[in-house]
Amino acid sequence: ITGNLIRKFGHSKIMYAGVFLFLITVLTSFFDQNFTNYLIALIFLGFGWNFLFISGTSLLVLSYRENEKFKAQGFNDLIVYSIQATASLSAGVFLTLTSWKTMNLVCIIFLVLIILSTLRADLKERK
């Protein structure tokens, strides 16, 4: 489904939609930590992650020559999953040292970086 959305609307719009879904996740988690909000946040997190991961991965292979695509995607997957594993393993420590609200605020920093890099790529593409 995400691939069809990318073909219809383009990589950037799906990435912005993914950031928006992540922002809903952060806001839902930030203000109340009850089970319902947690469940809603997980649903938006799943869709946001899917939109960002699929659009980013499909955009990555477009920037390489045909004979480099598989190596680039393999290296990208290694980096993404290594960072994901590190974040998962360190989340408990980070939560113990800070708070749930702080963790959500840190997510906003990464969302802003994604928006800025996507905007930059859009501006370069238009030139």
Question: Model-found features: residue ranges?
Answer:
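Helix-breaking motifs and short loop linkers at transmembrane-helix boundaries and internal kinks
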Residues: 10, 31-33
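Intracellular juxtamembrane helix-capping segments at the cytosolic ends
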Residues: 51-64
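Structural signature of the two symmetry-related core transmembrane helices
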Residues: 13-27, 108
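Paired small-residue
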Residues: 25, 36-44
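A membrane-interface helix-boundary motif in multi-pass transporters
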Residues: 93-111
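Multi-pass alpha-helical transporter architecture, strongest
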Residues: 108-127
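A late C-terminal transmembrane helix in Major Facilitator Superfamily
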Residues: 68-96
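Helix-to-loop junctions at the C-terminal end of transmembrane segments
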Residues: 1-11, 95
